C-alpha cells in the first residue's frame, strides 16, 4: 500500500493534491521541512499541465511481503493505470511513450491504441499518442552505458530507414 501511494507522490506535490498522513510523514522523515511542503501547496501548476504517461511491459511490479519487487509484466495495463491517474488529477493525458521488441511490437501497438481509444470513449481527454522510437536504438538496453553496438529493434523503422511491421501498423492507424 505504501509503495502504491508513493508512486503518486511527485505528482501530488506538483499538482497540489492533498497528501495523506503516511506520505506527509514520509516526506518529513526524509528531510523535507514543513515550510518546503507549504511551498508546494501554494505553488502547484496543475492549470497549465498535460499529464504524460509512458507505458511499457516493464512498468508494473509485484511487491512481495518482504518488500522486494520484481517486474510483473502487464497485470492492470495502460487503461487501468491511466484511469487511476486521470481520476486523481483530472488532467488531459498524452500516451507519450511505449514500445516492445519485435516481433511483438505490432500487437503491442494495437493494444495500446485500443486502450487509448477506450479511455477517450470513457470521457478521458486524450491529446496524443507516441510510439518510441522512430528508429531502432543502439545500446538502449544498457541505457547507453555500454558502447557495444547492440541494435535494439524497437523502432517504426530500422537504421537503414526501412519500415518495420510496427511502422506499417502505425501508418494504418493514422490513416484511419
Which ranges hold each PLM region?
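Active-site region of glycoside hydrolase catalytic domains
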Residues: 1-107, 114-176
